[in-house]
A protein has these predicted regions:
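Short, hydrophobic/amphipathic alpha-helical patches that form generic packing surfaces
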Residues: 17-28, 93-98, 161-165, 212-220
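Acidic, Ser/Thr-rich peripheral helices and adjacent loops at domain boundaries
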Residues: 52-57, 190-201
Length: 252
């Protein structure tokens, strides 16, 4: 039986590191007060435990989740971890402990706080990815298509398959300027590149500027002034996306 302890787990912020926190929790038969990653290190009244990332332990936990708890729980945990909200780690840990105690069917018990928390985390990530599939605007840069996004959550893994399937013959780069990671596709190679301190994309080609002017003119020409409804537009297309959209960036 695990007991609640006034201790904080420190980890490196990676998914593998989080899995090692799950391992640590079970090894010590305890539930920590919280789980923080090193980049947000701050003072606390509670003692801290540095949880080192061990790939062997991480793989053991991952294998256990998939084999004992099933794909639904696995995807809920993976998507929940992509969420950018603070405190996601302890909520995911409590969720996993409930699943191991009650079995994978407990994942459908959305009335349980542990389940509701993770459903909310995963849903927020999925919703933002769905929005970005609609709102991403590519520009021609240095012989390939480039786009910038500013998401709250780390959604690039959920955009990868969509855009690779949608543009099978195009080289492209999608840069997440909040997490400093780019999804890059060149030919058959698809990978992620992390940048320290950010990445400044090259300016669009001159031909691209011409196309953008034409697109803006077309967008404005379609508008019916009498039916303009700014509140409704922001409901369907939140303003935080506008700065990276060709037709709306001037209004952002």
């Amino acid at each position: 039986m695990a007991c609640q302890r006034d201790v904080i787990y420190w980890y490196d912020g990676t998914f593998e590191g989080f899995l090692c926190c799950v391992f640590e929790s079970y090894a010590n038969r305890e539930i920590p007060w919280d789980i923080w990653y090193y980049a947000t290190r701050q003072s606390s009244l509670f003692p801290g435990v540095d949880v080192q990332t061990d790939m062997v332990r991480a793989q053991r936990v991952l294998k256990s989740i998939r084999e004992k708890l099933g794909q639904r729980v696995y995807y809920m945990v993976v998507r929940g971890f992509l969420n950018g909200d603070e405190g996601k780690e302890i909520r995911l840990l409590r969720f996993l402990r409930l699943m191991y105690d009650k079995g994978p069917q407990a994942a459908y018990q959305t009335g349980a706080p542990e389940v509701a928390d993770v459903v909310q985390l995963a849903r927020a990530v999925a919703n933002e990815a769905c929005q970005l599939k609609q709102f991403i605007r590519f520009e021609e840069r240095e012989g390939m298509l480039g786009a910038v996004i500013s998401p709250k959550h780390y959604v690039l893994p959920l955009l990868r398959t969509h855009f690779c399937d949608r543009m099978p013959n195009e080289d492209f780069l999608i840069y997440d300027n909040q997490h400093y990671v780019a999804l890059v596709r060149r030919g058959e190679d698809v990978h992620y590149t992390r940048f320290q301190g950010g990445y400044l994309m090259s300016s669009p080609e001159e031909r691209e500027h011409t196309y953008q002017r034409l697109w803006k003119a077309f967008y404005d020409a379609l508008a019916i002034e009498e039916r303009r409804n700014e509140k409704l537009r922001m409901q369907h297309c939140p303003k935080r996306f506008w700065e990276n959209m060709t037709e709306l960036k001037d209004l952002a």
